[in-house]
Amino acid sequence: MQLALENISKKVGAQTWLYDMDLALHSGAVTVLLGATQAGKTSLMRIMAGLDTPTAGRVLVDGADVTGMPVRERNVAMVYQQFINYPSMTVAANIASPLKLRGEKHIDARVRELAERLHIDMFLKRLPAELSGGQQQRVALARALAKGAPLMLLDEPQVNLDYKLREELREELSQLFAAGQSTVVYATTEPAEALLLGGYTAVLDEGRLLQYGPTAEVFHRPCSLDVARAFSDPPMNLLPAQAATSGVQLQGGPLLVVHLPAESATGALTVGLRASALRVQARPGDLAVHGTVELAEISGSDTFVHASTAVGSLVAQLTGVHHFELGAPLALYLDPQQVYVFGEGGQLARAPERRKGN
């Protein structure tokens, strides 16, 4: 299915929920809608599904205008944050329902396959009311996958799941999407989820479409400060700077010898540095930034250390478990070639060169 939105906007009363935008999804691929709460992800999905109509603009499916077509006439599967299951039917019957409507063969085998992939095979004989919220959400997700609709819309489908299960299911979902032929739209607030799912990413902020493209490209070359903020977890370190003759001068810090395009080589700049680009051991060509430890926390297999420095507050993401004394002096090292530079208006002026395989 080729879904395209042309000059879509949505107003409710005096409020604008979606500003004018164009978005053409890639058929058979995953498109992630990435943005904070109230970025416009759900509003956009409801228009895609036919649950809402835009105030202006058109919705096209394979070139045909379906803007006013009700949802019941569209072949769409949608999973909401708030799961919806048939309460009087067992888990197995819930998952099997779209398969039976299509008259498919080997229904039991397909139901069990999906249940196993989503870790709910032990609940097949239970009713939804006997399950936890996270388990019910997985039932709704399995039913949507079973439907095999040409357009599948998933609105933060893992929001009710615990951290460990989310990590397990992300890879499973990526494989399930790749194995199917549906055009998938997946809304999330988590950059890590977008990176794992791959495909394409549309970054939304307060109803505006900021950037759309291949996920890796959007992550590595955010077109603006707003995109960089939305597509960074932990947040990108953003530091005030000035253009200099041979590069960028950090305010209160070292000179970064990097090339800037002529139109960005003057005035106030912002340097962006991902937390993973900072380290505590120097490599050839690195520059040092000195400060003191404000906070250190371990999350999973990484350590996050927050430091107060002359160039501003910095957060470094270090692989492995590291121990730091609060208030202790700390030297963080960075490779100038790994910095982003944004112009005075927030537009991207420079991005690090991508390494092979990234």
Locations of regions flagged by a protein language model:
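Glycine/charge-rich catalytic "coupling/switch" loops of P-loop NTPases
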Residues: 247-297, 322-358
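Conserved coupling/switch loops of ABC nucleotide-binding domains, chiefly the family-specific signature
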Residues: 55-58, 206
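ABC ATPase nucleotide-binding domains
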Residues: 75, 81, 85, 90-226
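Conserved structural motif at the start of ABC-family nucleotide-binding domains
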Residues: 3, 18-20
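Helix-to-loop junction immediately C-terminal to a conserved catalytic motif
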Residues: 49
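ABC ATPase nucleotide-binding domain helices that frame the ATP-binding cleft
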Residues: 42-45, 139
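The feature captures the beta-strand-to-loop junction immediately N-terminal to the Walker
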Residues: 34-36
